[in-house]
Structure formats: C-alpha cells, structure tokens
C-alpha cells in the first residue's frame, strides 16, 4: 500500500513543490558515489574561494536504487522518422517527454548585482516521476507529472512510496492568446499577434493545484542529435526554493529551454532576479539583484514501478480536469486574475488535495458537489472579482 497519509502528503508537498524535490544529488541512485573528498567540495560557477560557505541547499534524503534506460526510447525513434511535417515532428518531441524518470534539479546563482547581496549556495534536489499524456489532440498536448518516491532510511530500508500530484505542462500550437504573469500574484490574458503565433508552440506551466505559473511562446528546432524548444523572455513567480529564503526581489525573468534526447530530456533556465515597483514594473533604479542558471535532467528509467502513481492518476484525473476547467473559465470570463498570495505559501490548495485524496481512497468518481468545492477553493485564493 502506498502512503497517502495527510502528514506524508503535507511533507512532500512542502518539500517538493513547486520547484524541487527536497534532497541532494548525493543519492544519484543505481550509480556508485565517489569517495567523500578531503577538501571542501567545489561546485561549478559556485564561488569556490568562499570555501564551505556555499554548500548546496536542499534536503538530505536518499532514494531507492533505480535502473537507467540507456537505449534510445521508442518516442525518440518516432521523433527521428524521415519525412514528417514540421508540426508533427514538433508534436512528437513534446510527446517524447512522457515516461518514467529520475529527475535531478540544479539551480546556481552565478552573478550578483546588488552591493549588499551575498550569493546563495547552489540548490540541488531529486525525485522520481512519471509524466502522463493527459490529452493528445489536434494542436494540443497536455502532460501531467506525478511524483512517486521511495526513500532510504538510515538503516538502508526502503519506505513505502510517497505519491503526490506535481505539475502540468500544456502545449498549444499557434494559440490565439496567452496568460502571462504580471507580478504580485497577478496573471493577465493577452491576445497574440499573427507574427508571434505563426509556427510557434505555447507552453503553459501549472502548479500542483492547477493554478497558473507561467506561459511562453517558442519554436522547435530539430536535428539528429536533439530537438529543442526555446521560450521568449518570460516572467515567473518565485518558487519555494527562493521565497522561503529571501525577499529582496519579486519575479524571475528569463528563458526556458526544453531539449529532447535519446534517453530523456533536459529543462534549462537562465533567469534574472528582478525587483518590481508597487505598480508591477521593473524598478529602473535597481532592476536586478542576481542571475541564476537552472538545470533539470529527466533520465529515463527501465522497468520502473509507478503503480501507486498510476492508481492516483487514474482515480483523480476527472477531478483535476474539473479544477483545470474552472481555472480556464475564470480567465476566459475575467481576463485578469489577482490572487491573495502565493497558493503554495498560504496553503490555499489544501481543500483540493483533501478531496482528491478522498476520491482516490474511495474509488469514486468526481461528483456534482465538487464543482461547489472547487469554486469555493478558488474564491478563497482570490480568483473571482
């Protein structure tokens, strides 16, 4: 039986969402770790002259052993097929992100621009995750990420699996409009010009409760070595790994690149940490405090057991679809949504997760009463004006 107790769920949501998964890369499972160095460890671009003061942030858990799949995946081979139309090759690149993965996250502050700023230590974490194709329609693909993690205790015993919904990414071809983050917990829907839309795919990223996080437009490029999509400059709200340790800036401004390879995929971020005025504009007197690089590596697994994640996904899928549709309707009707604060920081998504847990435990379909619960939860977040 997998672990869905409230305490376990709350711990994993706090630790893993929205940006990372509460652990160090020392647990890179199924591969032998090198001996501990005698001198303080060094991290690329991480201010090595400061010695041990910039050791990585993150957690300290270790994961159960896994086996990496070193063979080219079927999705990669399908992506390489000759004679595909450009849009179809793009679609296959997006679908190639589905599967089972060991995920490692690295975020590194490489430059500081404020005289009083001190560089943060690198942030490193890990997780095991299954990415599901939730929808595959003409010009639209939706991918849902579910975490299923087994931890090693101090005696080397493997825990029962922890399961939680993580994030969702939607991909739409030549969209009519985009919902953009504007700072201070506000998102606005903006129509797109033909020049922005033509041949482009919009990626929209959603948080654990289906609330918006960020969206951007970009175009896929393909080669025999990899397929890659690069976003335009995008505003993003601060993730937990940042707002939990600092308050000297308000928005991440940067690019997001997805690169598909034979054995998995990589997500790269190049972010400026930007200061906003009370009017949600970049503060020209001190616009940026630092720059960071981010890297998430999704390494495909072989013979991985994600039965608990499958169970959760199948039983709660219709409920989370209702939540997603309610968010979409709010933006269609209002155009702008300003929340009362970060939903993960305030714990405003708790009623939604509690209801999803009930649905999973009882094996019942989402009911009519859920529409009221969802609207009430979104209302408490500040969705409705």
Walk through the language-model features, giving the residues of each.
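N-terminal secretory signal peptides that target proteins for export/translocation
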Residues: 1-11
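Bacterial N-terminal signal peptides
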Residues: 14-24
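Amphipathic/hydrophobic helical signal segments and adjacent flexible N-terminal regions
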Residues: 30-96, 109-114, 119-121, 139-142, ...
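A short, structured loop/turn motif at beta-sheet edges
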Residues: 95-99, 133-139, 257-265, 300-305
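Hydrophobic/aromatic beta-strand elements that line small-molecule binding cavities or substrate pockets
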Residues: 119-121, 125-135, 144, 253-260, ...
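Extended amphipathic alpha-helical segments with heptad-repeat/coiled-coil character used for oligomerization
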Residues: 133-181
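Short helix-loop boundary/capping segments
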Residues: 193-253
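Extended serine/threonine-enriched, polar tracts that run as long, contiguous segments within proteins
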Residues: 230-277, 288
